[in-house]
Design a protein with these regions (language model features):
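Aromatic-glycine hotspot motif
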Residues: 1-63, 75-137
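Histidine-centered divalent metal-coordination motifs
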Residues: 69
């Protein structure tokens, strides 16, 4: 697996500083990616669909919605990874996560399918990182 360098603060919007700091403070981000598949499976794999509809508060996401959000983010970051790895200098747009979750109809999706989808997306992203050249990293 490649080892990507940590980004400089001028390489990302200030909004992302907290995320970058948390991720880079834990060491090699790429090494952590496969472990998260197992952690999600262990934490959520035995939930029923009814249990996965739990939400902490009326305006909070359900467990299924959190899982759907993780899947959306895997797709978004896959696209961003492709753009950055190809030295595409055009602006990368954001996305409105609450709109994505609201429009996804995640209550109808089995939690096991959402977990499996995450695993496939994450494994594809891990493979994508292995093909990034040192110059692009």
């Amino acid at each position: 697996m490649n080892k990507l360098s940590h980004p400089n603060s001028n390489e990302y919007a200030e909004f992302y500083a907290g995320y970058v700091q948390r991720a880079t403070s834990k060491g090699d981000v790429l090494a952590a990616l496969p472990n998260q598949i197992d952690k999600i499976q262990a934490a959520l794999g035995n939930l029923s669909d009814e249990q996965a509809l739990f939400r902490d508060a009326p305006n909070e996401w359900t467990i299924k919605e959190v899982m759907g959000h993780l899947n959306d983010v895997e797709r978004v970051f896959s696209y961003r990874l492709l753009r950055v790895s190809r030295n595409d200098s055009t602006p990368i747009p954001g996305f409105e996560q609450n709109d994505y979750v609201r429009e996804a109809g995640l209550a109808a999706h089995p939690i096991k399918d959402l977990i499996q989808e995450f695993e496939h997306l994450r494994r594809a992203n891990i493979l994508a990182t292995q093909n990034i050249t040192a110059e692009a990293a």
